[in-house]
Regions:
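Feature detects amphipathic, helix-rich regulatory segments
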Residues: 1-212
Length: 212
């Protein structure tokens, strides 16, 4: 049984609800991402921060949740050390997000993430709100125009950091950004609980079958 689209990706379904309307939200302004973002390139080969990656549906997850072994290898020493509140754009195409995914790190203080990600910080904007905006249809349409030759052999879209930060985003006042980010966080929690309740009967059937 397939999940409802809202269960799979609430931001994609509801993101347009918050799109600025000039007639009733005059405080929203249009800015280039490069005007508000500062690139993050720090790394620390000696760090013991968790090794994480970005998935289109769940944002940051520990690499061990996806793979049974550490597949970073020698490249681990080049991994970017991202700090809580900073953002990373995974420009790998996926079925859910054909033009990549951007998320803010919020679950841990620091994380080591693949050096191929485009990483940045923002000082005067809410990073969680910004990730919602950057994963929305407005930015996706801009990225579609940037991608001229499809995916490279490594599966990454040919979008450089300098090109990514040329996209424009719509920004309300900081207080409204905070409210929207909080709303979506609460929504994600409710959806997770909803999915958990639906999977309980399935897990119970599996348990009974296993003990037969």
């Amino acid at each position: 049984m397939q999940n409802h689209p809202a269960d799979q990706e609430p931001r994609r379904v509801l993101g347009s609800f918050f799109a600025p309307k000039s007639q009733n939200t005059p405080t929203w302004e249009q800015r280039k991402l490069g005007e508000i973002a500062k690139e993050v390139v720090r790394n620390d080969p000696a760090s013991d921060a968790p090794i994480m990656m970005i998935t289109a549906g769940n944002g940051f997850i520990e690499q061990s949740d996806r793979y049974a072994f550490n597949n970073a290898g020698e490249s681990l020493k080049k991994y970017i050390l991202l700090e809580c509140g900073e953002l990373a754009y995974n420009h790998g195409a996926s079925k859910l997000r054909p033009y990549g995914s951007c998320f803010a790190l919020t679950t841990v203080e620091k994380a080591r993430i693949p050096f191929v990600y485009h990483c940045f910080s923002v000082e005067k904007s809410n990073p969680e709100f910004l990730s919602i905006e950057l994963n929305g249809a407005n930015v996706e349409n801009q990225l579609r125009k940037i991608v001229s030759s499809g995916a490279r052999m490594d599966g990454l879209l040919n979008i450089a950091y300098s090109e990514y930060t040329e996209v424009t985003v719509q920004l309300p006042k900081k207080e409204e950004q905070d409210w929207i980010a909080k709303f979506f966080k609460h929504l994600d929690t409710l959806i997770a609980l909803h999915q958990r309740e639906h999977i309980k009967p399935i897990l119970e059937v599996k348990r009974v079958k296993r003990n037969e």
